[in-house]
Amino acid sequence: MVMTKKVIFICGASHSGSTLLGLILGSHSACFYAGEVNKIQFLNIKKEHEDKSCKICGRSCPIWGNFILDKEFGLYKQLSKLTNKPIIIDSTKKIAWLKKQSNKLEIYQSKYLIYILRDGRAVINSQLRKYKDSDPEELIEKWIKHIKSTDDFYYNFSGKKIQIHYEALSSKPEDIIKKLCNFLEISYEKSMSQYYLHEHHPLGGNTGTHYLIIKAQKDNKKIDSPIQLSERNKYYYLDHPLEIRLDLRWKKELSEKIIKIFEKKAGKLNKSFRWND
């Protein structure tokens, strides 16, 4: 039986590229990207929920389809046993979950933390696109609160840790992937950047990024994805190449009014997140 040797946590704000990063790392032969693992709470509920199943193959998923957590055995050990992978990747954003799970790891399990940074203006734009009736000021306040708590978690994390920019990953994927492989002490595999050609079983995460896998593997009969592109995302992802590409839509979509509000409330905090204005 394969045992969990490493657990990689990916933290950051929502809509910061953690799904892309998780899928890239999960394309390594030794890794399994589980997605936002805290979504296991929705797997066995009776009512319908968007996070009730694997984002790629739906309820027939060989990993999550009949998954029942064995609390005695351990969550990540259970996933290693199911997938035959010694390295498990969890991109849950909730800090309470990350603290709990990182503290529960056994002494022989190494823990790593990757903090993915993305310009806060891009994050707010993505959130407004998804939640179009939201109050921009409320979203900005939530971003500030989450970033501060994530910064605190990162500062106090006792395992190996690193920060990377989504924009750097998307602009120079090979360089950043090699850097992360070195950090994680695993060999670099060239096919990792072609994550859309690999088998994946993530919970939660970005619908658009998952859609590119479905698009690339349209003839794979095992895929029965429950995801649907929103009207506001269709134009972007239907014509999106499979290759990794930097998303700077916020520069065209985010109004000057909202940018000014963001700068007033969060400009100082966003300094380390800004990307080549």
Show where each model-derived region lies.
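Conserved phosphate-donor/acceptor-positioning beta-strand/loop module used by diverse small-molecule
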Residues: 90-94, 101-128
